[in-house]
Amino acid sequence: MFTLIDLPYAPDGLEPVISARTLEFHHGKHLQGYVDNLNKLIAGTEFESMSLEQIVAKSTGAIFNNAGQILNHNLYFTQFRPSALRQAQGPTEARHSEDSDSSCHFDRAQRAEKSALITRLESQWGTLEAFQKEFVAKGVGLFGSGWVWLQADAAGALSIGQYPGADNPVAHGLRPLLTFDVWEHAYYLDYQNRRAAHLEALWGIVDWSVIEERYER
């Protein structure tokens, strides 16, 4: 039986980028719903003893959709950390600045010692800022609901994937590293229809040590 993951930060720990109210609904309602649905769907089936990754790789239909959403959200919520820099700003400055440069949302302190991931990102995109710009553009350009992923293949090569609905890299034999949720429930309470502003702000709370660990596994 699957259970709702605990968040590695306080309910208001990601403010002003993600409000406590959004987190309450996104984690406590939406994700809990997927967990409850999956447990009901797999009861008494071959999937009951499988891991989320195995279910995603082998299932279809409603089971895939709910398992995929749990896997997506688990990786999404655990990739963030409170940012002292962002917390020092007011909600209006953080949420409603349409002209902010996404590069300023990257914690440059985490660049002091280049990891294999950062080296690879710079090798493929030229600069981290260029990667961030393309990643946000892919998220903005994804029609409807879904996820944008930084993913790696077996050789460690990186790519940005656009996945509708509950789909994700695991279902395609790729390794999921970093994701931004572009389902409206992830941002509408805080940003309304300004998806780009939401995605740009997320760089301020990404915990790159988590992403690097996923890449180096």
Role assignments for model-derived ranges:
Residues 83-116:
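Intrinsic disorder/low-complexity segments
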Residues 1-84, 111-217:
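Feature for soluble, non-membrane regions of globular proteins
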